[in-house]
């Protein structure tokens, strides 16, 4: 027992050192999963011997240790095969090589640079869902890794390998769950992908995401056919967010020409963009804006969920206590928790990895301090 406890301490010390180093080298993340495998093997052996505590730590059940060891072996082997490619010189974070991201759609692929895509079902702004479009996807085909760009079109989110396109989010299936009319509008950055009738008339444009190119600006091309248009979204472009004020971001439809400083919504109304907005971010002079997610639900459910978020504390900056509105006219009993983020990108990564329970409603917003 003492021998197992000593080995467990050494293994966990190595894990803590790796967490503190916060390395961006792929080899270090291979070591991370190797030590997790060792840790699970020690727990498994201890449980087989009838030991339920090693030091101050509770020994998990055999099934839990076995499942965790299998997951660690899978991650270690995949990272070792990736290490033997030209992609080993790229920066890789602990989050990039996490099991949560590995199992997020598209599953069993490494991915980087998540961007938020808003889909308005029934073309209704109040009936919108957000999905993650990955800038870069690393796909393993026949024991070889291929680096491809994520794509979005009216059908869904996809990537293409050797001419074969794989959709990992199908908007038609999503519309069966969230919509009623089997119609939807896709918004990515400042681009809008329109209704099926428009797509059938003009063809199906694709918006690609670039992995290392600077963002490009769409220009008016009235003489060019819409089917020849391919828009590129640069990695520095902020993911879209729902605007609650009168101002709107300039939007460019993929089947038409850029409208410059105006935005045309699904009801063909023309609005002028907010003069304070700049590429999706508000420029407040002396103030600053912080991306937030507001969680609303039953108080105990929120507290339990906040406790579980401690395991992924690297995905957000701060969490508030539970609070409520005190307006006398409100009879709402639900409590609220506010999470803050260092950037819109971090918030997108949070939504891509963390599964929010159905009993908890969440809203995206910006907290501005003047």
UniProtKB/Swiss-Prot annotation:
Keyword Ion transport: no
Biased composition regions of type Low complexity, renumbered to the chain: 212-230
Pfam families given in the database record: PPV_E2_C (PF00511), PPV_E2_N (PF00508)
Entry-linked InterPro entries: E2/EBNA1_C_sf (IPR035975), Nucleotide-bd_a/b_plait_sf (IPR012677), Papillomavirus_E2_C (IPR000427), PPV_E2_N (IPR001866), Reg_prot_E2 (IPR033668), Regulatory_protein_E2_N (IPR036050), Regulatory_protein_E2_N_1 (IPR042503), Regulatory_protein_E2_N_2 (IPR042504)
Key words, A-Z: Activator, DNA replication, DNA-binding, Early protein, Host nucleus, Phosphoprotein, Repressor, Transcription, Transcription regulation
SUPFAM superfamilies, sorted: E2 regulatory, transactivation domain, Viral DNA-binding domain
Cell compartments where the protein resides: Host nucleus
Main location class: host cell
GO molecular function: DNA binding; DNA-binding transcription factor activity; nucleotide binding
Keyword Phosphoprotein: yes
GO cellular component: host cell nucleus
Chain spans, region DNA-binding domain: 289-370
Region entry Transactivation domain, spans: 1-200
Record region (Disordered): 212-255, 268-287
GO biological process, one term: DNA replication
Modification after translation: Phosphorylated.
Annotated family: Belongs to the papillomaviridae E2 protein family.
Entry function: Plays a role in the initiation of viral DNA replication. A dimer of E2 interacts with a dimer of E1 in order to improve specificity of E1 DNA binding activity. Once the complex recognizes and binds DNA at specific sites, the E2 dimer is removed from DNA. E2 also regulates viral transcription through binding to the E2RE response element (5'-ACCNNNNNNGGT-3') present in multiple copies in the regulatory regions of the viral genome. Activates or represses transcription depending on E2RE's position with regards to proximal promoter elements including the TATA-box.
Subunit and interaction comment: Binds DNA as homodimer. Interacts with protein E1; this interaction greatly increases E1 DNA-binding activity. Interacts with protein L1; this interaction enhances E2-dependent replication and transcription activation. Interacts with protein L2; this interaction inhibits E2 transcriptional activity but not DNA replication function E2. Interacts with protein E7; this interaction inhibits E7 oncogenic activity. Interacts with host TAF1; this interaction modulates E2-dependent transcriptional regulation. Interacts with host BRD4; this interaction mediates E2 transcriptional activation function.
Name of the featured protein: Regulatory protein E2
Organism from which the protein derives: Human papillomavirus 40
Gene expressing this chain: E2
């Amino acid at each position: 027992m003492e021998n197992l406890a000593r080995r467990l301490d050494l293994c966990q010390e190595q894990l803590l050192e790796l967490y503190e180093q916060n390395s961006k080298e792929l080899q270090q993340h291979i070591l991370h999963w190797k030590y997790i495998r060792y840790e699970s093997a020690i727990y498994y052996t201890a449980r087989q011997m009838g030991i339920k505590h090693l030091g101050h730590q509770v020994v998990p059940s055999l099934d839990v240790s076995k499942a965790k060891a299998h997951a660690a072996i899978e991650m270690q082997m995949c990272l070792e095969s990736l290490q033997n490619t030209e992609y080993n010189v790229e920066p890789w974070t602990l989050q990039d090589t996490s099991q949560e991201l590995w199992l997020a759609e598209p599953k069993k692929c490494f991915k980087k640079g998540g961007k938020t895509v808003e889909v308005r079902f029934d073309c209704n702004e109040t009936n919108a869902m957000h999905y993650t479009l990955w800038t870069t996807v690393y796909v393993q085909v026949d024991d070889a890794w291929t680096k491809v760009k994520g794509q979005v079109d009216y059908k869904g989110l996809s990537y293409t390998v050797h001419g074969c396109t794989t959709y990992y989010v199908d908007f038609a299936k999503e519309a069966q769950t969230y919509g009623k009319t089997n119609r939807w509008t896709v918004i990515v950055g400042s681009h809008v992908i329109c209704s099926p009738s428009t797509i059938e008339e003009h063809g199906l444009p694709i918006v690609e995401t670039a992995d290392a190119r600077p963002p490009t600006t769409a220009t008016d091309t009235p003489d060019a056919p819409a089917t020849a248009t391919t828009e590129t979204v640069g990695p520095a472009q902020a993911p879209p967010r729902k605007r609650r004020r009168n101002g709107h971001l300039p939007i460019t439809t993929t089947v038409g020409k850029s409208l410059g400083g105006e935005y045309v919504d699904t009801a063909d109304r023309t609005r002028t963009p907010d003069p304070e907005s700049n590429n999706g971010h508000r420029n407040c002079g002396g103030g600053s804006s912080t991306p937030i997610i507001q969680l609303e639900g039953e108080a105990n459910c929120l507290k339990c969920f906040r406790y579980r978020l401690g395991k992924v504390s690297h995905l957000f900056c701060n969490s508030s206590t539970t609070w409520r509105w005190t307006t006398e006219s409100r009879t709402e009993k639900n409590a609220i928790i506010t999470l803050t983020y260092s950037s819109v990108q971090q918030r997108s990564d949070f939504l891509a990895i963390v599964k929010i329970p159905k009993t908890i409603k969440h809203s995206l917003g910006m907290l501005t301090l003047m």
